[in-house]
């Protein structure tokens, strides 16, 4: 079985050198027939990783999906699925392997979309240097901590909205590909039906005409 691998953290050149918070990632790729594609994503111990995938193109709209820990433990294994959502709570830091397998298909390639969403507590804690600049008596009954919480809440909701819009775009792409495939099938079989109808019509005219042809010889 042919397979290949990719590293998602190559977009972050310093990710391999220092422990940084993983960034949310989304990717759409073409999975050839009879192939397996694996991606490696670095995760932190105290965070969570949400994986969502959809097959948006290709016959059957299905792939095999698996997630393996850095130590080689198989966490998730799904066969012939068109989509899925999984939340992984990393029990060990390192590179998790995410694989999509199309080896069961010998002809059809698949267009696959997947997204990784991270929730790491340590990455959200930023130094509040701005809070040390303003004295408490200068806050005028407005707590800077409340303002910060409101901003963080708005930021979190906006990020979630972006993620949902990305997922909806993937659904729309899959539905559009499915409609295009159905349109081709409808046009193909409609053309065959028209051809059959025209052939039957000519045969009926020919047979009716032959019934009225008097081929008997007339004696004089």
UniProtKB/Swiss-Prot annotation:
Ranges of residues in domain GOLD: 36-118
UniProt GO cellular component terms: endoplasmic reticulum membrane; endoplasmic reticulum-Golgi intermediate compartment membrane; Golgi apparatus; plasma membrane
SMART domains: EMP24_GP25L (SM01190)
Bilayer topology term: Single-pass type I membrane protein
Side Cytoplasmic, residues: 209-220
Signal peptide start-end: 1-19
One Pfam family per UniProt: EMP24_GP25L
Motif (COPI vesicle coat-binding) on chain: 211-220
Motif segment (COPII vesicle coat-binding): 211-212
Listed transmembrane segments: 188-208
Alphabetically ordered keywords of this record: Cell membrane, Coiled coil, Endoplasmic reticulum, Golgi apparatus, Membrane, Protein transport, Signal, Transmembrane, Transmembrane helix, Transport
SUPFAM superfamilies from the UniProt entry: Supernatant protein factor (SPF), C-terminal domain
Localization, UniProt: Cell membrane; Endoplasmic reticulum membrane; Golgi apparatus, cis-Golgi network membrane; Endoplasmic reticulum-Golgi intermediate compartment membrane
Parts forming coiled coils: 138-164
PANTHER family: TRANSMEMBRANE EMP24 DOMAIN-CONTAINING PROTEIN
Oligomer and partners: Homodimer in endoplasmic reticulum, endoplasmic reticulum-Golgi intermediate compartment and cis-Golgi network. Interacts with IL1RL1. Interacts with RNF26; this interaction is important to modulate innate immune signaling through the cGAS-STING pathway.
Function: Potential role in vesicular protein trafficking, mainly in the early secretory pathway. May act as a cargo receptor at the lumenal side for incorporation of secretory cargo molecules into transport vesicles and may be involved in vesicle coat formation at the cytoplasmic side. Plays a positive role in IL-33-mediated IL-8 and IL-6 production by interacting with interleukin-33 receptor IL1RL1. Plays also a role in the modulation of innate immune signaling through the cGAS-STING pathway by interacting with RNF26.
Homology family: Belongs to the EMP24/GP25L family.
Protein's name according to its UniProt entry: Transmembrane emp24 domain-containing protein 1
Gene, per the UniProt record: tmed1
